Amino acid sequence: MKIAVYGKGGIGKSTTSCNISIALARRGKKVLQIGCDPKHDSTFTLTGFLIPTIIDTLQLKDYHYEDVWPEDVIYKGYGGVDCVEAGGPPAGAGCGGYVVGETVKLLKELNAFYEYDIILFDVLGDVVCGGFAAPLNYADYCIIITDNGFDALFAANRIAASVREKARTHPLRLAGLVGNRTSKRDLIDKYVEACPMPVLEVLPLIEDIRVSRVKGKTLFEMVESQPSLNYVCDFYLNIADQILSQPEGIVPKEVPDRELFSLLSDFYLNPVDKTKDKKENKKEDKENSADFTWL
């Protein structure tokens, strides 16, 4: 099974991807995580350092694929998850999609691409040009990481459009949304109402999730010294279980940009006053109770 993880830049895709990868490994699966970002930091919390990229290695070997060995590009991460960083072209030059293609090509040459139960592509930001949509060509499922904010959901909608486009020619489905580090989910629910799709999980606003990135550790590794964080790992295990159940998934129908802009803007401009609603409900209950006469 191949999974592509997308979402707005800075939303926590890599942190989420690494924890999902370990959760899948904990379920007995052989997992490979491929970072598809020129920053090559996708697997940082799995390995604890920035591993050399495929492009770095190919350049050292003068692009002689026959001189590259699996151990040159595949690094063992925490929890038995194997890690690869595709890397990228120099800033302002080349195409990231080409790099993803070269990565897959090399892994196939090494007979490594088909050795895994799960391959997870962690893809750069919310860029959905043809190049960075390339991992969708190989994926069975796409997962979108979001939060309860306007920008993240707007990006999610554009990614949903990319999934729909790729699904025309590939057996690709959207597995669903994952809400990351958010104290509320009302805007997520509003979006899902307009663009129906599964919500796999919504992780609460837990500071340790952010801290784990800085420490270069996954939540699963942090639990070894902080058992109180065990409940956080359950969120990722729940996502893993849903993925392993091989959900039917959907081909999403994105909301038109202007319509979505209006929908999300209206939610901010005209928030529901829940306090007022509660007062009105109490008043209603009081009035209703007055209608009864005990005999």
From Swiss-Prot:
UniProt xrefs under CDD domains: Bchl-like (cd02032)
The UniProt record lists the keyword Oxidoreductase: yes
UniProt cross-references to Pfam families, sorted A to Z: Fer4_NifH (PF00142)
Top class in the EC scheme: oxidoreductase
Keywords: 4Fe-4S, ATP-binding, Chlorophyll biosynthesis, Chloroplast, Iron, Iron-sulfur, Magnesium, Metal-binding, Nucleotide-binding, Oxidoreductase, Photosynthesis, Plastid
Subunit structure: Homodimer. Protochlorophyllide reductase is composed of three subunits; ChlL, ChlN and ChlB.
Name of this chain's protein: Light-independent protochlorophyllide reductase iron-sulfur ATP-binding protein
Gene that specifies this protein: chlL
